[in-house]
Amino acid sequence: MDSSFNLAIHALVCLSHSGRSLSSEALAENICTNPTRVRRVLAGLKKAGMVETREGLDGGYRLTADPVSLSLRQVAEAINTRFVDCAWHSGDIDRDCAICSGMAGVMDALYRQMDEQCAAYLEQITITDIETQLFTQK
């Protein structure tokens, strides 16, 4: 997992809380990143119909999805987030050893199951839930 998921959630909560359009610069300042990174991540949210962009004086990004029902799983899927993944595989599928040739497949299945459990958990949490947590913390 990379920081894109965190950035997307942060931006969506900002947009929900503001109730208006915000520029990539305004979002970047609140997120503490650069506007180019914000635009890159929000492109996936725009494609998924969660935000829209507008040009002009009142331009920027505007939340179009209902934050009450927008789950963190939907956000993760919109930006292709995998929570548990491993790019490196031990062993060699061409070797004549059950452990050496089979470990990568077993571990990939394990990672997929862990990723699905994370996604199932995130299905229960919405953008409004995150916003509420932020404003009820002591």
Protein language model regions, located:
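N-terminal helix-turn-helix DNA-binding core of bacterial DNA-binding proteins
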Residues: 1-33, 62
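Generic hydrophobic secondary-structure packing signal
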Residues: 4-7, 55, 114
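Short, structured loop/turn "capping" segments at alpha-beta junctions
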Residues: 21-23, 52-54, 128
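Key DNA-contact positions within bacterial/archaeal DNA-binding proteins
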Residues: 36
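Basic amphipathic alpha-helical segments that dock to polyanions
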Residues: 41-46
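Beta-hairpin "wing" of winged helix-turn-helix
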Residues: 48-64
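Non-DNA-binding regulatory cores of transcription-related proteins
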Residues: 64-138
